[in-house]
């Protein structure tokens, strides 16, 4: 049916043939061709009531959306624009971009923050004040967060955001409104998020069907057939975050490194106590104690058993102050700092005080110490991701920065009032090489909605629970023209995963989380392929043999067909002859996978999904006593 979708896309482009690609307010911007294409299709099809902008970070989905909002009155005269966004993103990029390029629509905009505890009340209060003569255009920025907040919890308790989700699902199409969802990572934690997002865009089209069987998408063709034109897909980097990516004229190259650092004996002892405490408390599945212990440990493990919250806080404050006092009484000599900046270790010419101080810092945190040394040796600016803010997180990391004389800004929940301006200072042209501010340390607050320029090194100190969050984090530093001011030989971003390691070789919490991320991504990759093949770009490029239409009267029926719950096309198991092999997508073999190669050269992953056909003379390397096929 995609050929029919192509006919309507063609119709929309004919209707908007004379639409300008220039947007002017107090400043002027010319849209990229892909931005203009999306805008023309969405505005040219008045009955296209919803669209997902699945655009990777840095390609300008905010500007695309502002352009659409600016031209809504080309379609209908009375619009109220409701922007559902995170608090951190109201000012920049949204208010900033609208004021700069479409100030005339600001009076029609209502900002409602979905991370506000009173979000649903504010939403419905505003809805009641809107005239029935006005059409709504609802924007959901970082829609994966909105969807996640709308999922019913395991205890069955409905979350407040779900009532807004239900309202939009019921009323957008019914009352001829429009909805745009934006995300660089539309699925983050579970397949249920895909189902909820699709049903928001195409109400009740999926129902409660099971999409996977043994981690395989049951009927990919049926989904692609029925979900045509559900999204715009602008993703040039489809590689895993763990793979190297070559640079281009507009994007910096990316190399990934796994930096394994050994815990000291003291840190190992505290780590094992943290593990025991998790088992005792029944919280081992969350791994919080181990994650913190793998990052930093005080002289003693803070046992929370039989203690009041006040006692725990007081003990934490005491431990922090003791460590802070220790840090402030010592400093590295210029000689030591000079060695660190050259990437050199302390040696026989170094003072006993410098060597002792470095060892003491490493005793408490192998990861913080390693990162500080790497920051000093980096030729440019650095980003450091640390999800924990208090206790053993950013609070302590900044003491390490002080010890190593590293200049920094902080972007976290505790710097709400200053962080936007701090990023602006960090991004200034005169700080291209990090001469004024070397590093930005950020928590999950910095994973979305902000951009960094001329970054050379990113350090991931602690894993998130999914690849999507890590992709967002890395994407903040690798954006369109993000390195245009950087010297050509430094137009790269090195991503360092800092992984704590135990002396006995047992897997640490860092390694456990890496495995979880990789397993989740297998299903998500298949769903992202569905989005790609149902995008307006893919359809318009590949479905060219269509009969033109002269109106959009048939659009509604085309997009409202339900997914077949009993697909007729099923996989037929077949036996293939071949051998188990190891393979990698990277020449440097950052990640090595187990697969199966058939006698005729077809490669399948461990779940039976086809990867590619291996060339006649493949590149095979030896890695950790394994023969590894390097895929091109």
Curated annotation (Swiss-Prot):
Indicate yes or no for the key word Nucleotide-binding. Answer: yes
The source's domain of life comes to Viruses
UniProt: ATP binding residues: 55-62
**Which PROSITE patterns would you find in this protein's record?**
HELICASE_ATP_BIND_1 (PS51192), HELICASE_CTER (PS51194)
| Compartment annotation | Virion
Q: Which reaction does it catalyse?
A: a ribonucleoside 5'-triphosphate + H2O = a ribonucleoside 5'-diphosphate + phosphate + H(+)
Record-annotated Helicase C-terminal domain positions: 367-532
Q: List the disulfide bonds.
A: none
Residue ranges occupied by any Helicase ATP-binding domain in the UniProt entry: 42-204
Q: What is its EC number?
A: 3.6.1.15
- The short sequence motif called DEXH box sits at 141-144
Q: Which UniProt keywords apply?
A: ATP-binding, DNA-binding, Hydrolase, Nucleotide-binding, Transcription, Virion
Family designation: Belongs to the helicase family. NPH I subfamily.
Note the subunit structure. Monomer. Interacts (via C-terminus) with RAP94 (via N-terminus). Interacts with the cap-specific mRNA (nucleoside-2'-O-)-methyltransferase.
- Briefly state the protein's biological role: DNA-dependent ATPase required for providing the needed energy to achieve the termination of early transcripts. Acts in concert with the RAP94 subunit of the virion RNA polymerase and the capping enzyme/VTF to catalyze release of UUUUUNU-containing nascent RNA from the elongation complex. NPH-I must bind ssDNA in order to exhibit ATPase activity.
Q: What is this protein called?
A: Nucleoside triphosphatase I
Give the gene symbol.
NPH1
């Amino acid at each position: 049916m995609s050929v029919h979708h192509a006919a309507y896309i063609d119709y929309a482009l004919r209707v908007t043939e004379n639409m300008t690609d220039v947007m002017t307010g107090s400043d002027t911007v010319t849209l990229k061709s892909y931005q203009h294409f999306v805008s023309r299709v969405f505005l040219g099809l008045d009955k296209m009531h919803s669209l997902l902008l699945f655009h990777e970070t840095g390609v300008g989905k905010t500007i695309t959306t502002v352009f659409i909002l600016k031209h809504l009155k080309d379609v209908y005269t009375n619009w109220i624009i409701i922007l559902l966004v995170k608090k951190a993103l109201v000012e920049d990029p949204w208010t900033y971009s609208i004021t700069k390029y479409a100030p005339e629509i600001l009076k029609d905009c209502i900002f409602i923050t979905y991370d506000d505890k009173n979000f649903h009340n504010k939403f419905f209060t505003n809805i009641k004040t809107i005239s029935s003569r006005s059409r709504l255009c609802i924007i959901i920025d970082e829609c994966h967060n909105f969807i996640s907040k709308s999922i019913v919890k395991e205890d069955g308790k409905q979350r407040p955001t779900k009532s807004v989700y239900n309202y939009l699902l019921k009323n957008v199409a019914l009352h001829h409104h429009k909805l745009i969802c934006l995300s660089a990572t539309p699925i983050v934690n579970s397949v249920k998020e895909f189902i909820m997002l699709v049903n928001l865009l195409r109400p009740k089209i999926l129902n409660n069907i099971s999409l996977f069987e043994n981690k395989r998408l049951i009927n990919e063709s049926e989904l692609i057939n029925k979900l045509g034109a559900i999204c715009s897909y602008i993703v040039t980097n489809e590689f895993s975050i763990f793979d190297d990516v070559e640079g281009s004229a507009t994007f910096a190259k990316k190399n990934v490194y796994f930096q394994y650092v050994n815990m000291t004996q003291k840190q190992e002892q505290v780590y094992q106590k943290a593990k025991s405490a998790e088992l005792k408390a029944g919280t081992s599945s969350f791994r919080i104690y181990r994650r913190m212990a793998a990052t930093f440990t005080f002289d003693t493990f803070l046992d929370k058993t039989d203690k009041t919250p006040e006692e725990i806080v007081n003990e934490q404050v005491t431990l922090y102050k003791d460590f802070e006092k220790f840090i402030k009484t010592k400093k590295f000599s210029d000689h030591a700092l000079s060695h660190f900046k050259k990437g050199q270790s302390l040696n026989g010419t170094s003072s006993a005080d410098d060597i002792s101080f470095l060892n003491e810092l490493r005793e408490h945190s192998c990861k913080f110490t390693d990162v500080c040394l790497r920051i000093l040796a980096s030729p440019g600016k650095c980003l450091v991701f640390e999800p924990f803010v208090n206790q053993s997180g950013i609070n302590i990391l900044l003491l390490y920065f002080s010890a190593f004389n590293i200049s920094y800004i902080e972007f976290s929940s505790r710097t709400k009032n200053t962080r936007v301006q701090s990023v602006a200072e960090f991004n200034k042209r005169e700080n291209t090489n990090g001469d004024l501010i070397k590093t930005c340390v950020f928590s999950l607050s910095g994973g979305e909605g902000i951009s960094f320029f001329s970054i050379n090194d990113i350090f991931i100190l602690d894993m998130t629970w999914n690849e999507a969050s890590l992709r967002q984090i890395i994407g903040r530093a690798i954006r369109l023209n993000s390195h245009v001011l950087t010297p050509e030989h430094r137009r790269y971003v090195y991503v360092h995963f800092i992984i704590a390691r135990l002396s006995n070789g047992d897997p640490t919490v860092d390694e456990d989380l890496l495995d979880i991320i990789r397993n989740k991504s297998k299903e998500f990759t298949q769903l992202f392929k569905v989005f790609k093949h149902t995008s307006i770009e893919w359809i318009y490029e590949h479905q060219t043999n269509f009969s033109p239409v002269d109106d959009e009267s048939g659009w509604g029926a085309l997009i409202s067909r339900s997914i077949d719950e009993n697909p007729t096309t099923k996989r037929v198991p077949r036996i293939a002859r071949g051998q188990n092999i190891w393979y990698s997508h990277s020449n440097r073999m950052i990640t090595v996978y187990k697969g199966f190669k058939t006698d005729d050269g077809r490669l399948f992953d461990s779940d039976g999904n086809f990867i590619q056909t291996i060339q006649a003379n493949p590149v095979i390397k030896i890695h950790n006593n394994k023969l590894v096929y390097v895929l091109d």
